[in-house]
């Protein structure tokens, strides 16, 4: 195991900057996930740690050693890519041992390492098979095993589940989580799938246009996003946003006017520092935090546009006339409602988020479970 530290790391190709002044501390044994939309720089950041991309400026440390100029083979890292990249003419055992053979390891060491890793990954009964005889999930386990036999200090995974179908992704996600708990290795995992990030990570790094938007535990990012970008990216369906105007402030409270014909006002339990009366802001509320109208004091009403019945839950898209945008309401179980019907939902102030015009969040003061 080893820690990884990035200090003011920047990557640029000519005048195009793809990673901007990145500062990160990844502790020994942590499972850290880099997540963000396509083009945000997450894979580039991983490749700089691996040594596959040079660092334009800043410093990278693995353990206590500065690694900027160290060749990839000497960094003590192992990498798994989206593509399995297995040799089709070699057996599972031969694929897993290929790197050790190139390194000149003794046969008994190779056999011991391959057999040990095969047991961990439940591949022992498949060691004699060729890749074409394996399922997608088994091939990905072989690719992971090939990296593990080299005993890297840091394990890097670049979107390893993207080529798998939905059921296999769930299965492999569970297996990777179990593998980390069993081995205790430092793992850095890249994905654009925020569900993978939420379920796997000890710590999530959200990237936006080459910058670190927020670093934190999964529930911390879900309940207390630092800005509107993180709020909209973490969570599915994504957070609803409403334009509001500040009408009053008090200690640890901000009153806003909702964009409804009755101009209803509501006090939100958020930090009021630097919030000015009359300011235009955005109120955020997650679909699953909206309430049935009969148990709420603050009511929003609109026309049902789309009803998505998922069996275990219902997602209702409601158009609010005064703002000409849809809100998504999510409720467990089946909700029977027709498209075109008028539908009312409740807005719980304590579950609301408030964002300034520059996108930064006013700190929420409501204590959420698990954070």
UniProtKB/Swiss-Prot annotation:
Its EC number is 7.5.2.1. InterPro entries: AAA+_ATPase (IPR003593), ABC_transporter-like_ATP-bd (IPR003439), ABC_transporter-like_CS (IPR017871), ABC_transpr_MalK-like (IPR015855), ABC_transpr_MalK/UgpC-like (IPR047641), Mo/tungstate-bd_C_term_dom (IPR008995), NA-bd_OB-fold (IPR012340), P-loop_NTPase (IPR027417). It catalyses: D-maltose(out) + ATP + H2O = D-maltose(in) + ADP + phosphate + H(+). It comes from the Bacteria. Pfam families: ABC_tran, TOBE_2. Keywords: ATP-binding, Cell inner membrane, Cell membrane, Membrane, Nucleotide-binding, Sugar transport, Translocase, Transport. GO terms for molecular function: ABC-type maltose transporter activity; ATP binding; ATP hydrolysis activity. It is a peripheral membrane protein. GO terms for cellular component: ATP-binding cassette (ABC) transporter complex, substrate-binding subunit-containing; maltose transport complex. Residues 4-234 form the ABC transporter domain. PROSITE patterns: ABC_TRANSPORTER_1, ABC_TRANSPORTER_2, MALK. It is found in: Cell inner membrane. SMART domains: AAA. ATP binds at residues 36-43. Part of the ABC transporter complex MalEFGK involved in maltose/maltodextrin import. Responsible for energy coupling to the transport system. Belongs to the ABC transporter superfamily. Maltooligosaccharide importer (TC 3.A.1.1.1) family. The complex is composed of two ATP-binding proteins (MalK), two transmembrane proteins (MalG and MalK) and a solute-binding protein (MalE). This is Maltose/maltodextrin import ATP-binding protein MalK. It comes from Escherichia coli O6:K15:H31 (strain 536 / UPEC).
């Amino acid at each position: 195991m080893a820690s990884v530290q990035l200090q003011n790391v920047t990557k640029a190709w000519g005048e195009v900057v793809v990673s901007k002044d990145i500062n990160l501390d990844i502790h020994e044994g942590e499972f850290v996930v880099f997540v963000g939309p396509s083009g945000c720089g997450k894979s580039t950041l991983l490749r700089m740690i691996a040594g596959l991309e040079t660092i334009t400026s800043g410093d990278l440390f693995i353990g206590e050693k500065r690694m900027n100029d160290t060749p990839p083979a000497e960094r003590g890292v192992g990498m798994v890519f989206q593509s399995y990249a297995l040799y089709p003419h070699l057996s599972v055992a031969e694929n897993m041992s290929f790197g050790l053979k190139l390194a000149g390891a003794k046969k008994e060491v190779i056999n011991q390492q391959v057999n040990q890793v095969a047991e961990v990954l439940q591949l022992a009964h498949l060691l004699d098979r060729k890749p074409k005889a394996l399922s997608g999930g088994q091939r990905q386990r072989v690719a992971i095993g090939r990296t593990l036999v080299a005993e890297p200090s840091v394990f890097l995974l670049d979107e390893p589940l993207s080529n798998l179908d939905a059921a296999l992704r769930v299965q492999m996600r569970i297996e990777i989580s179990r593998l980390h708990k069993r081995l205790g290795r430092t793992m850095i995992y890249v994905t654009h799938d925020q569900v993978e990030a939420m379920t796997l990570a000890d710590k999530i790094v959200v990237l936006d246009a080459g910058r670190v938007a927020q670093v934190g535990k999964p529930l911390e990012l879900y309940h207390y996003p630092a800005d509107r970008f993180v709020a909209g990216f973490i969570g599915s369906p994504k957070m609803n946003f409403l334009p509001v105007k500040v009408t009053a402030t008090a200690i640890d409270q901000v009153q806003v006017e909702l964009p409804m014909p009755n101009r209803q006002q509501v006090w939100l339990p958020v930090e009021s520092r630097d919030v000015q009366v009359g300011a235009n802001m955005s109120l955020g509320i997650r679909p699953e935090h909206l309430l049935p109208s009969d148990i709420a004091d603050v009511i929003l009403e609109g026309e049902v546009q789309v009803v998505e019945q998922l069996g275990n839950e219902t997602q209702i898209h409601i158009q609010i006339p005064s703002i000409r945008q849809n809100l998504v309401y999510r409720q467990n179980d089946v909700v029977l409602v027709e498209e075109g019907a008028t539908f009312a939902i409740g807005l719980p102030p304590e579950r609301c988020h408030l964002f300034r015009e520059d996108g930064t969040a006013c700190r929420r003061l409501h204590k959420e479970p698990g954070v």
